[in-house]
Amino acid sequence: MRLYRAQALVLRSRSYGEADRLLTLLTRERGKLSAIAKGVRKPTSRLRAGTQPLTHSQLVLYEGKNLQTVTQAEPVESFAALHGDVVRFSHASSMAELVDRLSPDHSGADLFPLLLTGWHLLSVFPGDLVACLFQLRLLDRLGYCPELSLCLDCGEPVEIADSGPWPAYSPEMGGLVGNCCRHRHSEMGLIAPGALALLRHLLQMDPRDLGRLRVGPKLLRHVSAVLKETIRCRSEGNMRSWSVIESVGRSLTEEPELKAEQTEAEKESQRPR
């Protein structure tokens, strides 16, 4: 039993007892762990700022027999741009949920810089594109990265061609089946050449260059669907945050349409009869 310091990203927080919170943390030093923040729900608690979800904090923890306790919490970065934007916040929460679901306790320290970078990118770049980059690189770090270059059947390189049949992609198998072997896998879905090219690029590029990419919404939806299906096969289910992101997207799309309809209705009502 001892005190130790840790850099932590707060993945999740839930009420515990009358005034405490149980935190799920991703630490640079020890990976993912759970800790209790006692009295943090009281308005006067000094732990409040450093234990909020989606916060990068410097913590002092007491290592007990069964549960670790946060004794000090100082925020390093609160990511105001994420908390102030519902779309960015939804994507940041989804990243945290993915790390929580896919990494076991007391492991995943190598995911700390990936998630921290992801939250920084979300503060600047479009959420859907950052989410795709993060999901692919998370799969890669966890050893689940799909095979994007070679045919899983024969091992031959899969070329990207603007014309001709598309290669097949299997989330269950974890990658591509080229045209040379596709006849043996008629049940597989197909992947667009542009989507395959984007996935390869996202895996290799410098994340700081994300703003230079010009990706249409249709292609981005295709890539997102490929990654989500791959994650479902590894996590045995959906992420709850995905439905939140879809709901937020629908509401933002519908709002301008409703305003336009309301404006037209107002104009119609003002016309002389």
UniProtKB/Swiss-Prot annotation:
One of its GO terms (biological process) is DNA recombination. Residues 252-273 have a biased composition (Basic and acidic residues). Pfam families: RecO_C, RecO_N. Residues 249-273 are annotated as: Disordered. Keywords: DNA damage, DNA recombination, DNA repair. InterPro entries: ARFGAP/RecO, DNA_rep/recomb_RecO_N, NA-bd_OB-fold, RecO, RecO_C. One of its GO terms (cellular component) is bacterial nucleoid. Gene3D superfamilies: Nucleic acid-binding proteins, Recombination protein O, C-terminal domain, Recombination protein O, zinc-binding domain. Involved in DNA repair and RecF pathway recombination. HAMAP family: RecO. Belongs to the RecO family. PANTHER family: DNA REPAIR PROTEIN RECO (PTHR33991:SF1). NCBIfam families: reco (TIGR00613). This is DNA repair protein RecO. It comes from Heliobacterium modesticaldum (strain ATCC 51547 / Ice1). The lineage of its organism: Bacteria, Bacillati, Bacillota, Clostridia, Eubacteriales. The gene is recO.
